[in-house]
Amino acid sequence: MALPLSTCLLFHPKESRSRRFCFSPASASLKSGLHSATSAKIASMPTCFEQTRGRIAKLFHKDELSVSTYDTAWVAMVPSPTSLEEPCFPDCLNWLLENQCHDGSWARPHHHPLLKKDVLSSTLACILALKKWGVGEEQIKRGLHFLELNFASATDKCQITPMGFDIIFPAMLDYARGFSLNLRLDPTTFNDLMHKRDVELKRSNRNYSSETETYWAYIAEGMGELQNWESVMKYQRRNGSLFNCPSTTAAAFIALRNSDCLNYLHLALKKFGNAVSAVYPLDIYSQLCTVDNLERLGISQYFSTEIQNVLDETYRCWMQGNEEIFMDASTCALAFRTLRLNGYDVTSDPVTQILQECFSSSFRGNMTDINTTLELYRASELVLYPDERDLEKQNLRLKLLLEQELSSGLIQSCQLGRSINVEVNQAIEYPFYAIMDRVAKRKSIEHYNFDNTRILKTSYCSPNFSNEDFLFLSIEDFNRCQAAHREELGELERWVVENRLDELKFARSKSAYCYFSAAATFFAPELLDARLSWAKNGVLTTVIDDFFDVGGSVEELKNLIQLVELWDVDISTECYSHNVQIIFSALRRTICEIGDKAFKLQGRCITNHIIAIWLDLLNSMMRETEWARDNFVPTIDEYMSNAHVSFALGPIVLPALYLVGPKLSEEMVNHSEYHNLFKLMSTCGRLLNDIHGYERELKDGKLNALSLYIINHGGEVSKEAAIWEMKSWIETQRRELLRLVLEGKKSVLPKPCRELFWHMCSVVHLFYSKGDGFTSQDLIQLVNTIIHQPILLNDQTGAGLSKLHD
């Protein structure tokens, strides 16, 4: 079951301190987008790329929102404040007269065939407005003819039912009867509509709650004499509107002549001219949607200045308690998630309060918006502080709710064409901390729905919600980067051969996996050197780990450490064995190569630091070897102080920090923040490894964190209890790591460097999500999708993009 009315609505009655709920602007999308794309044609269009980029940039400077014939019709019904016999907004009437479709309806251009109920509702509202003021007889006649021909759609269960349709549309039919409009309607359909309205009203009365009151207030124009207008006006906002909805506000003014309602309608018309939109204002949500699209699709780097401006403005509005954010569940959740992920200091209290209201409500009727539920779930994942227990609890409840939706098999989205079941399944199976950045972006591209239609009481759209330009740019960028990544992988594989690492028969060959972990996390072309440093050191740590585990004698291991300590040695005479010679030669050559590249960026020699990083790893591995040889059983603390280093992430991550752009001073790399980030990241990895490798290592007679935890507790703790404790430890370490990565004000390390620690944390979470490290077939498929398989357009989407960009 999705969240109820409260997830879609946040209202603020004047005499109540508790928040209520308002309709979320994210409702329905109508076209299924891309599943796959050819890079050949796209790669040959640099001019088209820039043109597309330019069109997207314009979205930051102008919010484009469609007008609503339904809401405009209700505004047109508003009488003058000085005379009930004259329209207050005659220009709205003229707009209705000029915008009737050829078939007699007042439909949006190119409306979806499943939106016939919306078209019926909009058309009837327009007829009522014209009839009220005695204009447009010909338009009324054509509109009535359209209604009569299409009336059966009003009860068609295959059609999308706009919010409140079953109440509002029958009410408007009653209004039409009062205007003596001669509607020749099928009596069976008409009676079915009226019966359904009566049933819903009776059900709502039986289960009356604050949520019911909220819902009735939102559909005020359809309640007629049943409406308690005093109750409705509790939901009036500071801008004079009811729910930022022109139609509801117009109905309220018609009933009460409230001057603030009228002022709001003037503002809405000032924004759009002679018509209004279905929701106003929607600027913050629209801009956040643009940012979210760009970030999810992996093209935010092309709009960094524009995005920064949106984030700063959103943060300003957040701090001011702007109603546009806090009166809407989706906007609040999206703003919180976007701001927190971009390092802004925002409290989770508003999101928690929304969720507490949701779950405390007994109302499970008219409003079930799975899209808003998913948005709230994503926001609730971002627990950073120990005092955010309430947010953590709500996250677990939301996860359970989404799992129930999936298992029911009845999960539906208000956004037609959106693969909401896929999104929900992915969100549950791969939390944000357990999916690598490029993997998430490819999935977003593959399931992208570029229709931008949403549905509340009527449909509306905006290119800020989604559009083909976002899709086109993301496909081209992904495939272009992927082509470069394939070349880099080829370079890595040549490096393996040139350094004779392929001759080491004891070692696992994992060059593709090592490179994948880099390409799937920091993929920008300019980070080539950082990726290759990461991947080469990943290969070397795998080789050396195997050397310590199975490939080398104690004499060889000691010799390797001694060679690294001495460094400038004659390998032809100082190496204990052929294997040691290959490993040390590759290690020394690679460290020097990385040191030379880093020198160009840093302006100082960092080779000795890389050597020290490697020595830390080698000595920690040697310590574990000696413990095993001597049958020494360390305490869990002794084990972890060494094991977080022996997990071997140091040589992979730390040298790469010098190659991602910012300069790192010696003071920075000696700072406690640097070491804390490394320890948190490595502890997560080590504990995940030890949980998943417990049975195998137990059979091999090896100790790890899980077995030591059980031993240190006298064997009185079960394996399951120990695993639960380990996972809690991982969660604590991961959240602290994320907090340090996101909090920028007090940070010493530059953000691009801090992010590498989080990227590696995501890598290890994904690698251990299904099996023990490099064993999952799913992982093999992921490597192929990120490095080898370009995104291909299906026929329908490809034709749409070709038409758009030819």
Swiss-Prot record:
Keywords: Chloroplast, Lyase, Magnesium, Metal-binding, Plastid, Transit peptide. GO terms for cellular component: chloroplast. Disulfide bonds: none annotated. Its cofactor is Mg(2+). Binds 3 Mg(2+) ions per subunit. CDD domains: Terpene_cyclase_plant_C1. Its main location: plastid. A motif (DDXXD motif) lies at residues 545-549. It catalyses: ent-copalyl diphosphate = ent-kaur-16-ene + diphosphate. One of its GO terms (biological process) is gibberellin biosynthetic process. The Asp-Asp-Xaa-Xaa-Asp/Glu (DDXXD/E) motif is important for the catalytic activity, presumably through binding to Mg(2+). Pfam families: Terpene_synth, Terpene_synth_C. Mg(2+) 1 binds at D545, D549. Residues 1-48 form a transit peptide. Pathway: Plant hormone biosynthesis; gibberellin biosynthesis. PANTHER family: ENT-COPALYL DIPHOSPHATE SYNTHASE, CHLOROPLASTIC, ENT-KAUR-16-ENE SYNTHASE, CHLOROPLASTIC. Mg(2+) 3 binds at N689, E697. It comes from Salvia miltiorrhiza (Chinese sage). GO terms for molecular function: ent-kaurene synthase activity; magnesium ion binding. This is Ent-kaur-16-ene synthase, chloroplastic. Catalyzes the conversion of ent-copalyl diphosphate to the gibberellin precursor ent-kaur-16-ene. It is found in: Plastid, Chloroplast. InterPro entries: Isoprenoid_synthase_dom_sf, Terpene_cyclase_plant_C1, Terpene_synth_N, Terpene_synth_N_sf, Terpene_synthase-like, Terpene_synthase_metal-bd, Terpenoid_cyclase/PrenylTrfase.
